[in-house]
Swiss-Prot record:
Histone binding-protein that regulates chromatin dynamics and minichromosome maintenance (MCM) loading at replication origins, possibly by promoting chromatin openness. InterPro entries: G-protein_beta_WD-40_rep (IPR020472), Glutamate-rich_WD_repeat (IPR051972), Histone-bd_RBBP4-like_N (IPR022052), WD40/YVTN_repeat-like_dom_sf (IPR015943), WD40_repeat_CS (IPR019775), WD40_repeat_dom_sf (IPR036322), WD40_rpt (IPR001680). PANTHER family: GLUTAMATE-RICH WD REPEAT-CONTAINING PROTEIN 1 (PTHR45903:SF1). This is Glutamate-rich WD repeat-containing protein 1. The lineage of its organism: Eukaryota, Metazoa, Chordata, Craniata, Vertebrata. The modification Phosphothreonine is found at residue 10. WD repeats lie at residues 212-252, 259-299, 306-345, 351-391, 412-445. The gene is GRWD1. Residues 121-135 have a biased composition (Acidic residues). Pfam families: CAF1C_H4-bd, WD40. Interacts with METTL18. Interacts with CDT1; origin binding of GRWD1 is dependent on CDT1. Interacts with CDC6; origin binding of GRWD1 is dependent on CDC6. Binds to histone H2A-H2B and H3-H4 complexes. The keyword Phosphoprotein applies. Its main location: nucleus. One of its GO terms (cellular component) is chromosome. GO terms for biological process: DNA replication; nucleosome assembly; nucleosome disassembly; ribosome biogenesis.
Length: 446
């Protein structure tokens, strides 16, 4: 959440903000700041962060930016709210040269909450205590890297029993599976990490690779119900099914699922049915498939014009029969799969003013979701929210008339946002990746 520097206060969506003239000091007309819509910044103004709008906020950089990452479930427990937090990420870089790319395991720890400003009139002794406290509160990052030839388009992590693995889509047109157990071990042990970086990292290779796609791709999803079952989709409109075999390998069906006419952008397995998945494409469609049918006949349902242009991302709710989609048109759409044949979403939200790059339902709260866009916004939403008619905000401030009432929070400050994920074990914690690096935060709204 940001505010205009030099103005009285920040505001959340739907809350008015009084402005003060820099020349006269007099109060101007109350306004709502809407990112991407105005009012535009005047000369000498800039946006500043309102730390009181965040429970937690940290940033990290890893050298080359990462186009994709996934959160690795850990053994530290579920529903963790006590600070400081520890979390693990698996990410892949997009370096300037193919030889400079890395698959990485990150351990972020000692992640404290935002600290309230010191009270006015605090003495020197209190300031010294604050400096010592700041040192103890510094966030920490451990990083284990594996060389990878080619930029990494997408990373998705799954557990095969007790074995964590990462599916990796390469810009070189190959999909690989890497075992992650050793990487998880070394980021927890500084001595083991030093040994790994010195002696082991250059020797670490994928445990399986598939080069049968006709080019590069981005779509990839592990089944949440059948361990090891994987889908991969490419920019040539093809989707392939991976089936795990004995001995830790995979059989990849060479017959692609037929239906899309352009690049397959995203894939999502059903969280309730073993054989059903959804796909979206640059052909503007969303399709529902059943792998029990032959690949040429497996498409069961189609919404041909789901968005006005490319459908970039989809996410299947684990709590409701809802599919969330985001497109090049900047729209966010919620589809009730019980009514998917109608071809109409049950809700459409238009806050983003550039293509949507990532969407995800909250893992614990069925009506809450987050989205990121090429407009450098991360938005948080709640389908259950309705505007209070007695509040009268829309009448008193015309800027609220077009503001979606389900919009909870707008986060800014990143550059070229690519992907976000809710942490499945730390309620309300969001992680994003962008050209500007990683951000871990939790807002006061979720």
């Amino acid at each position: 959440m940001a505010a205009l520097k030099g103005r009285r206060r920040t505001c959340e969506p739907g809350e008015s903000m009084e402005t003060e003239s820099q020349e006269t000091g007099s109060k101007g007309q109350a306004q709502v700041y809407l990112p991407g819509r105005g009012p535009p910044l005047r000369e000498g103004e800039e946006l500043v962060m309102d730390e009181e709008a965040y429970v937690l906020y940290h940033r990290a950089q890893t050298g080359a930016p990462c186009l994709s990452f996934d959160i690795v479930r850990d053994h530290l427990g579920d529903n963790r709210t006590e600070l400081p937090l520890t979390l693990y990420l698996c990410a892949g870089t997009q370096a300037e040269s193919s030889q400079s790319n890395r698959l990485m395991m990150l351990r972020m720890h000692n992640l404290h909450g935002t600290k309230p400003p010191p009270p006015e009139g605090s003495d020197d002794e209190e300031e010294e205590d604050d400096e010592e406290d700041e040192e103890e509160r510094k966030p920490q990052l451990e990083l284990a890297m594996v060389p990878h030839y080619g930029g990494i388009n997408r990373v998705r992590v799954s557990w095969l029993g007790e074995e964590p693995v990462a599916g990796v889509w390469s810009e070189k047109g190959q999909v690989e599976v890497f075992a992650l157990r050793r990487l998880l071990q070394v980021v927890d042990d500084p001595q083991a990490l030093a040994t790994f970086l010195r002696d082991e990292q250059t020797r670490m290779k994928p445990i399986f690779a598939f080069s049968g796609h006709m080019g590069e791709g981005f779509a990839l999803d592990w089944s949440p119900r059948v361990p090891g079952r994987l889908l991969t989709g490419d920019c040539q409109k093809n989707i392939h099914l991976w089936t795990p075999t004995d001995g830790g390998s995979w059989h990849v069906d060479q017959r692609p699922f037929v239906g899309h006419t352009r690049s397959v952008e995203d894939l999502q397995w059903s969280p309730t049915e073993d054989t059903v998945f959804a796909s979206c494409s640059a052909d503007a469609s969303i399709r529902i498939w059943d792998i029990r049918a032959a690949p040429s006949k497996a498409c069961m349902l189609t919404t041909a014009t789901a968005h006005d242009g490319d459908v970039n991302v989809i996410n299947w709710s684990h709590r409701e029969p809802f599919l969330l989609s985001g497109g090049d048109d900047g729209a966010l759409k919620v589809w009730d799969l019980r009514q998917f044949k109608s071809g109409s979403p049950v809700a459409t939200f238009k806050q983003h003013v550039a293509p949507v790059t990532s969407v995800e339902w909250h893992p614990q709260d069925s009506g809450v979701f987050a989205a990121s866009g090429a407009d450098n916004q991360i938005t948080q939403w709640d389908l259950a929210v309705e505007r209070d008619p007695e509040a009268g905000d829309a009448e008193t401030d015309p800027g609220l008339a077009d503001l979606p009432q389900q919009l909870l929070f707008v986060h800014q400050g990143e550059t070229d946002l690519k992907e976000l994920h809710w942490h499945p074990q730390c309620p309300g914690v969001l992680v994003s990746t962008a050209l500007s690096g990683f951000t871990v935060f939790r807002t006061i709204s979720v």
